[in-house]
Amino acid sequence: MEQIFEKLMYASRWIMAPIYLGLSLVLIGLGIKFFQEIFHILPIIFEITEVDLVLVTLSLIDITLVGGLIVMVMFSGYENFVSQLDVGEDSEKLSWLGKLDSGSLKNKVAASIVAISSIHLLKIFMDVKNIDNDKIMWYLLIHITFVLSAFAMGYLDKMTRAGK
């Protein structure tokens, strides 16, 4: 009975495979939104202000960072929790593939979240005159929380690795 239970539990990791595949659909959605933003801005590129162009650029960078985060979670999560990716010797292999353990992945995700939060904060500062001070304070507190959390996770990971 125990052996059957353990085999079933081990096989249940494959439930995550379609979830990781589903993230690729989110990636397609981000790609569509990215190019929608570009096609929206191109016809009016000579009419918009520099500040508006910077805001659009920050939005595009934000989408790109989220896309990179999705790719990292998809591949690393699949490799760490489901099965090793067998992309073949003749195709390009990402240099970090197979090297990110769950601790490294958490640190990279935390760093990405801080970067994404920084971009949102920069967009808010570019429009500071139209945003209430209370909202700005909350945005700053949330960002500082992300930064401190990322720092703490990195420090704990470093301490854990030093103890091995």
UniProtKB/Swiss-Prot annotation:
The keyword Transmembrane applies. It is found in: Cell membrane. Keywords: Cell membrane, Membrane, Transmembrane, Transmembrane helix. It is a multi-pass membrane protein. Belongs to the UPF0114 family. NCBIfam families: HI0507. This is UPF0114 protein Shew185_3725. The lineage of its organism: Bacteria, Pseudomonadati, Pseudomonadota, Gammaproteobacteria, Alteromonadales.
